């Protein structure tokens, strides 16, 4: 696993069945001491975090990307140079206007949009937005 010795990964999911399945996979991989699960909504989990982070992978309710990112910023949870990786921003572009404006135009981030096809569907355009916190 590509984490520093003292590093860990925190996964947040509101669906208890998804968390249970993920825990089994992580246990099978022998990573149960490196991966921690929070079974709650994103805003509850963000408010519960005690330490800042270097990498954030966002892939949940698309209309919450922007508000959750602002919450993390306001709580000083994103380390300088931290990466925010937002998934599925192409197919849900209409819900991403505030998010895009913030990571592209606020000056707080250096951001890049990378186009791709939706998994398992070569005929559907999608994209990810990768942003570095300045």
Where are these regions (language model features)?
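Conserved SAM-binding loop of SAM-dependent methyltransferases across substrates and taxa
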Residues: 1-5
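S-adenosyl-L-methionine
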Residues: 15-52
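Short SAM/SAH-binding signature in class I
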Residues: 51-58, 83
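Switch II (G3) loop of P-loop NTPases
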Residues: 59-63
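C-terminal substrate-binding/active-site "lid" region of AdoMet-derived donor-dependent transferases
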Residues: 64-134
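A general structural motif
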Residues: 6, 53, 79-81
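Short, conserved active-site loop motifs that form the nucleotide-linked donor/cofactor pocket
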Residues: 7, 34-36, 82, 109
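Conserved SAM-binding motif I beta-strand of class I
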Residues: 8-13
